[in-house]
């Protein structure tokens, strides 16, 4: 393996036109690799700190020159000479250099860019694809794509409270077949929306953002689109939600569909939805601080539904350990920029899987062409990936990378399919 010779960084744009950090790492053997950092719209209060400039006269305060400078002036010089293959040592050195609990001094966006670029450089130097370098010789499982095809909440300007309505092609035989099913359903939905005179404009993650009366209307439209595309709702293509309920939680109540609801009332709502629609997964059904509500919900419906903690856990092993102890969820959403280093991300996935939980690798609403999470999904044997609709090139880039990985694996490739959702009884 080769040592790190130099680290560079620059300010680039994400899919929402906001600045983000891109890092390049040069190794002593001449290898040059780069990584770009995503950014979220609905962010958990406990996420690692995203360092922005705050200068309203430049990019409306969202510039990342401070984070770029942190890479160039502090992080780079501190890790030069380290072996690129010593990922944990590199990441721990950055954490120590930052010296804060939430990476506020150097910025999680600066640290993550370096962490991912180092991993890519090590893989490139070893002449291995990233999924193989990180996952070892047994990495061979392609994830089920959780495709967000109707956007609401913080990802769209509509009257729908739930942030994401997803389709999951669990009945397909291969990843490429599952992707095709999702694409055909997506186009079927677009035609259906047009026929009903509804808006076909896109939200941040490539899904449609029609004005609808209520959340169930979105589920009904998707079910109809699945059938019109020639697939069976439930057994071939199931449904998933990201409620992002922290966005409408205030003073101990959920302001949902025009009513103030308790955690128990939200739990009853989800139970009713699951009884009427083929739901396999609900993300952030309750708020990030409602530990008691989460534990109650998991006890009520966790045996038949995947309950995913995003804002609840923020990819943080410490918060995940608390959730495991309280039995607050049965799955974790994994976003690399929530925690800020690859090592901590992999630690969170490992802890979840050892504890009998599932893990879902996820993009952010502000993405780039970087495809790292596609490789991570295969490397960690997560069996699930959430990376938007099959539209907008920053989303499609991840799907295309998974197609390449499937092709490279050849006959060894296995599609997770229904096995990724062992609790689903439909």
Curated annotation (Swiss-Prot):
One Gene Ontology biological process: glycolytic process
Pathways per UniProt: Carbohydrate degradation; glycolysis; pyruvate from D-glyceraldehyde 3-phosphate: step 4/5
Superkingdom classification of source: Bacteria
Residues bound to Mg(2+): 242, 283, 310
Enzyme Commission no: 4.2.1.11
Record PANTHER family: ENOLASE
Protein name, entry field: Enolase
